[in-house]
């Protein structure tokens, strides 16, 4: 009898990188959890099925306190895929692994450019990047165009994604390489996550997160502001916290000194 020998198939191991939300709690943790609950209550499903990294580098907590924090997040359906900034002594079997090597900032040179005009004539803009955190800041309104004079930054090669159809409830569009433009509306329960700016030529009723990989010069433009949640470079705010006169209006938003500013467009 003849034996046929075959080599076993090799196991293929590949590396991939994925976009994950990074939560950076601050002390006291109970107060931070209350703010997180407020975010979740006003933006249902925000954390559902989303990979989350817990950054504890700035927290002086023990292993038991870390386990309790992870349990609190788990009870809120926040699934922690890994820990960042944790000491090895803080982690035991059954806890999420320690992650290293995350890059909150894009490795693209960012030259300075002059500010651009509002969205109807506006061209693609984008820039540098950082991670999202769970803190919030006030949205300021301004009637003066001089409040926008801070020069945005742009990549030498700008990339963009153009969507010619409305984004329906439950859909998630993630494009970290540059700007996202939607020729239509974004429904409640839908979300747009862009590495650059977001341009919506319709009603924004879902979630819009610009500068998701740390582009502080990113902006959000929409023809009708009714958003569930807005974020630029990890600073988030609910649209209902905006001045009432801006709701339902064409609006642009940008980040200035870690505060989201908003202005009505003509």
UniProtKB/Swiss-Prot annotation:
Keyword Cytoplasm found: no
Family: Belongs to the MinC family.
Biological function: Cell division inhibitor that blocks the formation of polar Z ring septums. Rapidly oscillates between the poles of the cell to destabilize FtsZ filaments that have formed before they mature into polar Z rings. Prevents FtsZ polymerization.
Comp. bias intervals (Basic and acidic residues): 109-124
Assembly with partners or alone: Interacts with MinD and FtsZ.
NCBIfam families: minC (TIGR01222)
Pfam families with a match to the protein in the record: MinC_C, MinC_N
Source organism of this protein record: Allorhizobium ampelinum (strain ATCC BAA-846 / DSM 112012 / S4) (Agrobacterium vitis (strain S4))
GO BP terms, alphabetized: cell morphogenesis; division septum assembly; regulation of cell division; regulation of cell septum assembly
Protein name stated in the entry: Probable septum site-determining protein MinC
Keyword field: Cell cycle, Cell division, Septation
């Amino acid at each position: 009898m003849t034996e046929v020998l075959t080599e076993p198939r090799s196991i293929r191991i590949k590396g991939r990188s994925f976009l994950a939300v990074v939560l950076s709690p601050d002390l006291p943790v109970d107060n931070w959890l209350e703010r997180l609950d407020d975010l979740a209550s006003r933006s249902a499903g925000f954390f559902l099925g989303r990979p989350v990294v817990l950054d504890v580098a700035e927290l002086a907590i023990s292993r038991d306190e870390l386990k309790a924090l992870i349990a609190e997040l788990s009870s809120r359906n926040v699934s922690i895929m890994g820990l960042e900034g944790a000491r090895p002594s803080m982690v035991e079997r059954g806890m999420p692994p320690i992650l290293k090597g995350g890059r909150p900032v894009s490795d693209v040179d960012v030259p300075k450019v002059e500010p651009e005009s509002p969205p109807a004539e506006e061209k693609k803009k984008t820039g540098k990047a950082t991670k999202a955190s769970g803190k919030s800041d006030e949205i300021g309104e301004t009637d003066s165009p001089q409040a926008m004079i801070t020069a945005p930054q742009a990549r030498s090669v700008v990339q963009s994604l153009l969507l010619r159809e409305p984004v329906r409830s439950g859909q998630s569009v993630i494009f970290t390489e540059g700007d996202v433009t939607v020729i239509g509306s974004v429904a409640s329960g839908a979300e747009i996550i862009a590495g650059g700016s977001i341009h919506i030529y319709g009603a924004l009723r879902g979630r819009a997160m610009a500068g998701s990989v740390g582009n502080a010069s990113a902006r959000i433009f929409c023809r009708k502001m009714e958003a569930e949640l807005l974020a630029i470079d990890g600073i988030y705010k609910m649209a209902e916290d905006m001045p009432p006169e801006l709701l339902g209006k064409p609006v642009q938003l940008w980040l200035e000194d870690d505060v989201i500013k908003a202005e009505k467009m003509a």
